[in-house]
């Protein structure tokens, strides 16, 4: 039976963190800005527990794909909230929302 080399695992994690920071400069800048106006730099408290040094910032999402502001594409295996039901930006839902918004969206 083999054992896990914890030192090697820690070294790999450190290397991945460096790569993440290098590859996400725009997300890092936005996170630093967000920290000035939001607790933990995120819109919801459960988002504070991010696995890396800062979260990615999404530019857009379609179906099960999210694109961050750096242009990296991710497959969204979580599809939280309404994304789980229909994917991100389903055309029929986007069209229905746009039709309604043209009628007014801030009425009391």
Enumerate the predicted regions with their spans.
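Generic, well-ordered alpha-helical segments
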Residues: 26, 58, 66, 85-89
């Amino acid at each position: 039976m083999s054992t896990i080399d914890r030192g090697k695992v820690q070294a790999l994690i450190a290397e991945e963190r460096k790569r993440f920071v290098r590859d996400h400069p725009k997300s890092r800048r936005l996170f630093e800005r967000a920290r000035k106006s939001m607790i933990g730099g995120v819109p919801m408290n459960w988002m504070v527990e991010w696995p890396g040094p800062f979260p990615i910032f999404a530019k857009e999402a379609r179906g099960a794909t999210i694109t961050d502001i750096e242009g990296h594409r991710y497959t969204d295996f979580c599809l939280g909230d309404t994304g789980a039901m229909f994917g991100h930006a389903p055309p029929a839902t986007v069209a229905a929302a746009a039709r309604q918004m043209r009628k007014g969206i801030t009425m009391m």
